[in-house]
């Protein structure tokens, strides 16, 4: 996973939640050891909302628009809900520390490969 704006890269497995079931389950009941990228049908705020139901630990969540520019980010704790401040087309969920490792800030552009 690469922060194009800052030139920072981390090597981590990337998986996609590109259908309803994968988006519904997300990282529930799992320890996050990889990055899960949600591909939403539309760029929206409400449909980009996330929850920490049945999560075992906090995760980093990054919201991106259709240009893969960061529009919001948060640390999602178990059993909490979060609605991004701006519409998102992609949601990146990963283990705590991803945001810091990539020095991610709103406005940065991210890139990824299916598997690294």
From Swiss-Prot:
Using the chain's own numbering, where are the disulfide bonds?
none
Q: Tell me the Pfam families matching this sequence.
A: DUF192 (PF02643)
NCBIfam families, alphabetically? PRK03760.1
The UniProt similarity line reads: Belongs to the UPF0127 family.
Could you identify this protein by its name? UPF0127 protein PF1050
**Species name:** Pyrococcus furiosus (strain ATCC 43587 / DSM 3638 / JCM 8422 / Vc1)
């Amino acid at each position: 996973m690469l922060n194009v704006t800052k030139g920072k890269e981390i090597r981590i497995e990337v998986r996609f939640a590109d259908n309803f079931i994968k988006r519904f389950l997300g990282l529930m009941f799992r320890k996050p050891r990889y990055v899960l990228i949600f591909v939403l049908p539309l760029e929206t705020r409400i449909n980009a909302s996330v929850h920490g139901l049945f999560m075992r630990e906090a995760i980093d969540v990054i919201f991106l628009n259709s240009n893969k520019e960061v529009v919001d980010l948060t640390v999602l704790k178990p059993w909490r809900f979060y609605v991004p401040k701006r519409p998102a087309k992609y949601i990146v969920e990963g283990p705590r520390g991803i945001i810091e490792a990539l020095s991610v800030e709103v406005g940065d552009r991210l890139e990824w490969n299916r598997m690294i």
